Amino acid sequence: MAVQQNKKSRSARDMRRSHDALEPNALSVEKSTGEVHLRHHVSPDGFYRGRKVIDKGADE
């Protein structure tokens, strides 16, 4: 089991944790429909980069 040699100071601990913060997800607005979706993902209505890529009627 790993055991530290010396105690880490509060400053060293906090500096290490400075990169751990979560960032909000990057969102995009679909050009053709104005729908908001995650970057590099198909929008809920089946459009991606202005083109219809999924036909929702065929699934149902």
Swiss-Prot record:
<keyword id="KW-0687">Ribonucleoprotein</keyword>
<protein>
    <recommendedName>
        <fullName>Large ribosomal subunit protein bL32</fullName>
    </recommendedName>
</protein>
<dbReference type="Pfam" id="PF01783">
    <property type="entry name" value="Ribosomal_L32p"/>
</dbReference>
<dbReference type="GO" id="GO:0003735">
    <property type="term" value="F:structural constituent of ribosome"/>
</dbReference>
<dbReference type="InterPro" id="IPR011332">
    <property type="entry name" value="Ribosomal_zn-bd"/>
</dbReference>
<dbReference type="GO" id="GO:0015934">
    <property type="term" value="C:large ribosomal subunit"/>
</dbReference>
<comment type="similarity">
    <text>Belongs to the bacterial ribosomal protein bL32 family.</text>
</comment>
<keyword id="KW-0689">Ribosomal protein</keyword>
<feature type="compositionally biased region" description="Basic and acidic residues">
    <location>
        <begin position="11"/>
        <end position="22"/>
    </location>
</feature>
<feature type="region of interest" description="Disordered">
    <location>
        <begin position="1"/>
        <end position="60"/>
    </location>
</feature>
<dbReference type="GO" id="GO:0006412">
    <property type="term" value="P:translation"/>
</dbReference>
<dbReference type="InterPro" id="IPR002677">
    <property type="entry name" value="Ribosomal_bL32"/>
</dbReference>
<dbReference type="InterPro" id="IPR044957">
    <property type="entry name" value="Ribosomal_bL32_bact"/>
</dbReference>
